Amino acid sequence: MAKAPMRVAVTGAAGQIGYSLLFRIANGDMLGKDQPVILQLLDLPQAQQAVKGVVMELEDCAFPLLAGVVITDDPKVAFKDADVALLVGARPRSKGMERKDLLEANAQIFTVQGKALDEVASRNVKVLVVGNPANTNAYIAMKSAPNLPRENFTAMLRLDHNRALSQIAAKTGKPVSSIEKLFVWGNHSPTMYADYRYATVDGQSVKDLINDPVWNNDVFLPTVGKRGAAIIEARGLSSAASAANAAIDHVRDWVLGSNGKVVTMGIPSNGEYGIPADTMFGYPVTTANGKYEIVKGLEIDAYSQEKINITLKELEEEKAGVQHLLG
């Protein structure tokens, strides 16, 4: 018996990340090779022509799982009955723009989108915010959708997680697939804290294998935290394919389960590990049956606590900067 199509809304559909994302969703990489999808694509009025071009290419791939495509500039059309919503579109920082202005510009976008999701999306919609500042944008969307369960809103920390994995693989000379229990705490920003104290590679402790706190502090964390800037420097454009890949990983694990593996998701806190409730924070989680669960009982040493406090402070400042816009 063929499955009924799932409706996947993608905002910023004409953008670089969208272009890397849509073909993989239509190919079944995100929701499974037996799951038909209907893509509901949102972008600004001036981008509609570009979205049409992308849709022509999607048609030309003749994906067996692509059951339909909707193109719109109206969030209520894009989010109608959506099972999954990938909020990729966000206002990028332009030259001379203060972070405060960026937060405010995005707060307006994500308030509108949160309200539209609240009105028309499936009550079980799984929302992933990719557009930066991702944690705070996800917080705004969640707060603007009081009738949806707050745990349905998540922010993308998976790119930081995958970047950390690849750095550990390079350092240990082991394949990425052999590394487990690595995760990232906090904000999707250079303050994130990638934590390999519990990680193993082929069952061996990564911490013991590397055994180099100076490398951790001076090389590993800055490399992972500033990787986005390094890619802009090298490529002249921000990371798009790797961000799309991380979004696919995040949603795939959330929907289909992580098979016991620990992954990282930005999720609303319930006070776990001393993080104030409602903060959209990167946590180690496992996923099963469409739900995520925070890994409990991890010891936080003094160094880790200091790093967590730094990223939390940044998130609290961002949150304070948009509070007046949330009514």
Swiss-Prot record:
A single GO molecular-function term is: L-malate dehydrogenase (NAD+) activity
Q: What does this protein do?
A: Catalyzes the reversible oxidation of malate to oxaloacetate.
Q: From the UniProt record, list the reaction(s) this protein catalyses.
A: (S)-malate + NAD(+) = oxaloacetate + NADH + H(+)
Question: What PANTHER family does the entry give?
Answer: MALATE DEHYDROGENASE
The family classification in the record reads:
Belongs to the LDH/MDH superfamily. MDH type 2 family.
Its protein name is Malate dehydrogenase
User: What are the record keywords, sorted?
Assistant: NAD, Oxidoreductase, Tricarboxylic acid cycle
Major enzyme class = oxidoreductase
Q: Where does substrate bind?
A: 93, 99, 132, 163
Q: Which NCBIfam families match?
A: MalateDH-SF1, PRK05442.1
EC numbers listed for it are 1.1.1.37
What processes in GO biological process is this protein linked to? malate metabolic process; tricarboxylic acid cycle
